[in-house]
């Protein structure tokens, strides 16, 4: 048995042969080169504003500290999905994913339906209703003045 080395005359044939049509657009090669983009940005900083959409906006640099790290964010998403999938099927069937359900819950127009489905704590419902009534009374009294 012979072992292959880097000094062998005989080279192994390539294993991967891509004969499909390429999805890359060759003319974009020079436009999207990182070296070219950095060079253009150094020559003319306003070049970057074309990508941002606002020519008056100044670039901002710095860290954005967050109390959450990636693992915490993943756990929050997992808990949200778990809560969504623990709902009864007759409620879940109206929503294709947890995000759609959450946006529906946050819409004030759906508040009565959320209450009818029993998804809210009855005590919190009463507190919210009394607060809304109080706010409406204040608006009416301020409009009368």
Curated annotation (Swiss-Prot):
Keywords annotated in UniProt: Host cytoplasm, Viral capsid assembly, Viral release from host cell
Q: Where in the cell is it found?
A: Host cytoplasm
The residues forming the signal peptide are none
Q: What is its main location?
A: host cell
Query: Could you say which protein family the record assigns here?
Result: Belongs to the microviridae B protein family.
GO terms under cellular component: host cell cytoplasm
Role of this protein: Participates in the assembly of the viral procapsid in the cytoplasm. Released from the procapsid upon genome packaging, possibly through affinity displacement by the protein ORF8, or by proteolysis.
Please give the name of this protein.
Answer: Internal scaffolding protein VP3
Read off the NCBIfam families from this record: chlamy_scaf (TIGR02763)
């Amino acid at each position: 048995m012979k072992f292959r080395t880097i000094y062998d005359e005989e080279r192994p044939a390539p294993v991967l042969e891509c004969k499909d049509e390429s999805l890359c657009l060759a003319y974009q090669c020079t436009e999207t080169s990182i070296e070219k983009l950095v060079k253009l940005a150094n020559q003319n900083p306003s070049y970057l504003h074309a990508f941002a959409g606002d020519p008056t906006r100044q670039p901002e640099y710095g860290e954005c500290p967050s109390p959450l790290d990636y693992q915490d964010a993943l756990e929050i998403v997992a808990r949200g999905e778990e809560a969504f999938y623990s709902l009864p099927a007759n409620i879940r069937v109206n929503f294709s994913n947890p995000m759609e359900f959450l946006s529906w819950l946050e819409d004030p127009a759906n508040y009565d339906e959320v209450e009818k489905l029993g998804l809210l704590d009855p005590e919190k419902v009463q507190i919210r209703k009394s607060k809304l009534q109080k706010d409406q009374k204040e608006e009416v009294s301020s409009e009368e003045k």
